[in-house]
Curated annotation (Swiss-Prot):
InterPro entries tied to this protein: Cyt_trans-like, NadD/NMNAT, Rossmann-like_a/b/a_fold
Recorded GO MF terms: ATP binding; nicotinate-nucleotide adenylyltransferase activity
Catalytic activity: nicotinate beta-D-ribonucleotide + ATP + H(+) = deamido-NAD(+) + diphosphate
UniProt record similarity statement: Belongs to the NadD family.
This protein's UniProt keywords: ATP-binding, NAD, Nucleotide-binding, Nucleotidyltransferase, Pyridine nucleotide biosynthesis, Transferase
Protein name: Probable nicotinate-nucleotide adenylyltransferase
GO biological process: NAD biosynthetic process
Species lineage: Bacteria, Pseudomonadati, Bacteroidota, Flavobacteriia, Flavobacteriales
Function: Catalyzes the reversible adenylation of nicotinate mononucleotide (NaMN) to nicotinic acid adenine dinucleotide (NaAD).
The organism's place on the tree of life at top rank: Bacteria
Amino acid sequence: MKIGLYFGTFNPIHIGHLIIANHMAENSDLDQVWMVVTPHNPLKKKDTLLDDYQRLHLVNLATEDYPKLKPSDIEFKLPQPNYTVNTLAHLQDKFPSYEFSLIMGEDNLNSLHKWKNYEAILQNHQIYVYPRLNTDTIDNQFINHQKIHIIKAPIVEISSTFIRENIKNKKNIQPLLPPKVWKYIDHSNFYKK
């Protein structure tokens, strides 16, 4: 089974995340997309970052009607700080019959050379890349790489920061969130302070 890993803080998950994840699941050779919720770094203070399990719950709510999208808390169980290369190795050990790939935006691809052991990632895993606004061009060392697949996908520029700020300022952002996610956020009074 081919699994695409889509990492994020998902603070909160929004329709932009779902559009990209679902597009990758439906328009590539991936069988599933796992939405990997990245844990809070205890060394960094982040007033607006919800608890790891609250964010995971939001991802569960958002993906429950999408059979090819699965929430994942795999990084919660790994020593911190963690690196993507470690997560990939752990998953390959845990699920040896699965083929794991990364999903990332063009902006992240252009900084891939700064990632820990990025060469090992490229040697052992496919990378599916979606377009982003304000990304000039893809770095030449990656543009024709056999393990990198540029996927034509909708360009969705919605940010979780924008959503949090608008909730705090009592603006209506319901169209940007899956209905169950909005209901849970509103009921729990998240991001209002």
